[in-house]
């Protein structure tokens, strides 16, 4: 089936609910889809919809155990999760005074009830349409997650898919609601939602790398020069996304003359393993005597200018064949749809769906579309862009919470303009905090408006700053094996890649100092820095909440005991990311997004661990037929013996035949090492690097099992994080006389009570200690006091 519907709906029969799960009246139909999910339809004409919609593509859920009791006027339905009471044939809406008069759904075992038009005020919210020009307080849209334990999705206005596989308006004005009654089982709610609307896309592997977007006018030579500069700086780049200035002035769908040969450009980018993307606005006018006009005018009414809006099936087909396919055949890999119309989300959804399907069917490759959030099952095909955000700290401060709130609607791929898009003041500290957030987010796009003074190019900062940027953009590329595995888990199990702490720790929702923290995949915790540093100590004072268990800082390896609050200090080059005890982080040491030849595997002590690395060709759907490589990493931990087993479990033809490994046992002392395949030894070398034990295995067959055993007396070294160490580091970096530093050290870390320490610090003014330093050390004493 070559239609858009045929791509998303494999079997139309699955769009119809089972007969014995439906209760049908003259004007209503109630479908019990799962024990937590009920569909409510009301149509005075008594006609109900079994076709798929833009949002809903599956209703053939297994039969649910429920009881239905009814009289001539009343209906009651009971499942293990909810009890529904309905006055038959009445509209679902009650009066303003008694809104649940006609319909009420109660969560069993609670006093919480849902009714039509319920405000759902305790909903945690999800991402909005965009953050274009954001200012002020963040207001989120309604998501699925609520402390009430219920949420409703209104599908009444969605287009339906007809028998020809094309979308059309509904014939009647109806109510078509899906009510999720899940108590505290958000994970099960998301499973119901994904089955109803489709599971998330499997993102192409290249999309997880570093993107470049600057809305400038480029020539071929400009692009060649920029790409080569990234290579010279040893900064990986995976996508080059053109802004709104790639097309002709009077033809918004044809390359301008500055890009002389798009296919030649495409060939160059392919040679550098970089994908080409375009920004496109499907609402742009089409003017007479242009290439696009001449192609579509015979099929539309003649006019001096044409437009694909308002959309209909004829226009969408013309758009597909004369715009999308033309550009795909011209070398375009990705589309950024800049149809910025918050009031017309259904049209935005249509364009996204047509772009996605056209690319998949034309190139026989996985597709991905960038778009603002129309919130119509966008998890199936889209990367949500937050829009043209302002370059400032205020915007950065709301991004972590905004990004992870997407998970409350089953969405993972949210892309911010890293650095901010426009306006504001270019500032390195702000820029690096944006980059660090991007590294530990599902997407990273260096982006800005056109303008000479927007500095997104890493080499335009001074040398020390450039090295920090380079460090993090390379770290992003290193993390791709981990990210791609987490993306696969999201695609198959529906577990969002980033998740707020309040899923496990509801109290965090009401603690503004910690609300921005989130889990990044299954192994990491991120505590984003979104405020300016203290210029005197040259560090940010960051408050942290560490969850249950033992956690280790990703970079330093410092140990943090869980279920505790901390205060730490971070320089520009530092970022608070933590790994659980027993975590195994598999990373790439190559400078591209391919399945790596050279891997680094970081293992954190404290408990047993395992991780299943997933790899495939990164671009096609062949993985659906089993074309994938699965490698198990198993870590057996004891006080005096560490064992790591690397065991290939599935098809290995998609990975390099020979691989090299850098195994990094974090916080580990010197040990006796053996490396084997279980039968014979494998050549390897061992060394100590800072607090870590490094084992290098130069080359081994990817199909080989590897067993690494470390034995010694108390292998884990003591790296418990101490605030005194942080403060000593601050003191060491300050430009203060060394003799004064010694006096300050004795005061800060001596046995005097805090009150007397304050007095002694103030006395140092007589010794020449400047007031700004006195104030800083008094504040540090307060920090010590609170820890």
Q: Which positions does each model-derived feature cover?
A:
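A low-complexity, Ser/Thr/Gly/Pro-enriched, surface-exposed linker/loop concept
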Residues: 8, 33-72
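Short, well-ordered beta-strand segments enriched in hydrophobic/aromatic residues
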Residues: 30, 38-42, 77-84, 525-528, ...
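Solvent-exposed beta-strand/loop surfaces of large extracellular or lumenal domains
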Residues: 51-65, 553-572, 673-697
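Catalytic and substrate-binding clefts that recognize carbohydrates or anionic sugar/phosphate headgroups
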Residues: 68-207, 214-216, 227-232, 504, ...
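Aromatic- and carboxylate-enriched substrate-binding clefts and catalytic-loop regions
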Residues: 106, 110, 117, 236-469, ...
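A conserved hydrophobic secondary-structure block that centers on an alpha-helix together
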Residues: 133-134, 213-259
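C-terminal low-complexity, glycine/proline- and small-hydrophobic-enriched intrinsically disordered tails
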Residues: 582-787
């Amino acid at each position: 089936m070559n239609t858009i519907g045929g791509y998303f709906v494999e079997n139309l029969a699955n769009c119809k609910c089972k007969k014995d799960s439906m209760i049908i009246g003259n004007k209503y139909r109630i479908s019990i889809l799962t024990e937590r999910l009920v569909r409510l339809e009301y149509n005075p004409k008594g006609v109900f919809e079994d076709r798929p919609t833009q949002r809903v593509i599956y209703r053939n859920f297994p039969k649910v155990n429920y009881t239905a009791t009814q009289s001539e006027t009343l209906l009651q339905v009971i499942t293990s999760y909810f009890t529904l009471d309905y006055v038959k044939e009445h509209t679902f809406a009650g009066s303003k005074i008694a809104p649940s008069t006609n319909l009420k759904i109660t969560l069993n075992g609670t006093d919480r009830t849902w009714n039509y038009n319920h405000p759902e005020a305790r909903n945690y919210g999800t991402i909005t349409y965009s953050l274009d020009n954001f200012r002020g307080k963040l207001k989120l849209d309604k998501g699925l997650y609520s402390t009430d334990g219920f949420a409703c999705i209104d599908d009444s206005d969605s287009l339906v898919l007809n028998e020809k596989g094309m979308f059309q308006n509904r014939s009647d004005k109806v109510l078509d609601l899906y009510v999720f009654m899940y108590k505290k089982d958000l994970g099960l709610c998301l499973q119901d939602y994904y089955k109803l609307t489709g599971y998330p896309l499997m993102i192409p592997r290249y999309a997880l790398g570093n993107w470049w977007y600057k809305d400038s006018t480029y020539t071929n030579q400009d692009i060649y020069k920029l790409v080569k500069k990234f290579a010279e700086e040893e900064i990986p780049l995976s996508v080059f996304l053109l802004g709104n200035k790639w097309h002709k002035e009077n033809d918004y769908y044809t390359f301008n003359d500055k890009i002389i040969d798009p296919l030649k450009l495409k060939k160059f980018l392919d040679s550098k393993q970089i994908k080409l993307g375009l920004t496109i606005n499907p609402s742009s006018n089409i003017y007479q005597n242009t290439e696009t006009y001449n192609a579509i005018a015979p099929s539309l009414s003649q006019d001096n200018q044409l437009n694909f809006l308002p959309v209909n099936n004829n226009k969408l087909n013309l758009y597909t064949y004369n715009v999308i396919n033309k550009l795909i055949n011209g070398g375009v890999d990705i589309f950024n749809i800049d149809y910025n119309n918050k009031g017309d989300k259904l049209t935005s959804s249509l364009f996204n769906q047509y772009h996605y399907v056209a690319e998949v069917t034309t190139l026989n490759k996985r597709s991905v579309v960038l778009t603002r959030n129309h919130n119509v099952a966008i998890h199936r095909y889209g990367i949500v862009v937050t829009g043209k955000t302002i370059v400032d700290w205020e915007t950065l401060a709301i991004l972590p919470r905004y990004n992870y709130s997407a998970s409350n609607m089953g969405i993972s791929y949210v892309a911010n303009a890293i650095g901010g898009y426009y306006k504001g003041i270019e500032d390195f500290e702000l820029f690096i905090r944006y980059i660090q957030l991007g590294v530990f987010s599902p997407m990273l796009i260096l982006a800005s408006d056109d303008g000479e003074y927007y500095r997104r190019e890493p080499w335009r900062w001074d040398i020390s700053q450039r090295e920090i940027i380079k460090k993090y953009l390379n770290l992003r590329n290193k993390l791709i094996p981990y990210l791609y595995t987490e993306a696969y888990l999201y695609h198959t199990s529906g577990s969002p890649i980033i998740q707020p702490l309040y899923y496990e720790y509801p109290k965090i929702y009401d603690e503004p100092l910690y609300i921005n923290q989130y889990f990044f995949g299954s192994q990491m915790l991120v505590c984003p820095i979104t405020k300016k540093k203290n210029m005197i100590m040259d560090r940010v004072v960051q408050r942290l909440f560490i969850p249950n268990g033992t956690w280790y800082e990703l970079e330093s390896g410092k140990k943090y005991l869980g279920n505790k609050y901390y205060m730490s200090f971070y320089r520009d080059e530092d970022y608070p990311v933590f790994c659980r005890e027993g975590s195994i982080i598999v990373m790439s040491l190559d400078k591209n997004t391919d399945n790596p030849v050279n891997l680094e595997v970081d293992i954190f002590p404290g408990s047993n661990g395992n991780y299943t690395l997933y790899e495939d060709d990164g671009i096609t759907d062949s993985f659906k037929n089993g074309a994938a490589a699965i490698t198990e990493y198993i870590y057996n931990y004891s006080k005096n013996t560490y064992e790591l087993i690397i065991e290939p479990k599935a098809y290995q033809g998609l990975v390099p035949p020979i691989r090299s490994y850098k195994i990094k046992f974090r916080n580990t002392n010197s040990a006796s090492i053996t490396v084997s395949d279980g039968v014979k030894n494998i050549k390897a070398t061992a060394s100590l690097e800072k607090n870590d034990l490094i084992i290098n295995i130069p080359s081994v067959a990817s199909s080989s099992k590897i067993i690494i055993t470390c034995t010694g007396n108390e292998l884990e070294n003591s790296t418990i994080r101490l605030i005194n160490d942080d403060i000593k580091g601050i003191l060491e970096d300050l430009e203060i006389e060394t003799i004064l530093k010694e006096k300050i050290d004795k005061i800060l870390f001596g046995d005097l009570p805090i009150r007397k320490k304050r007095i002694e610090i103030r006395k140092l003014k007589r010794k020449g200690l400047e007031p700004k330093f006195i104030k800083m050390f008094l504040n540090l004493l307060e920090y010590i006091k609170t820890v």
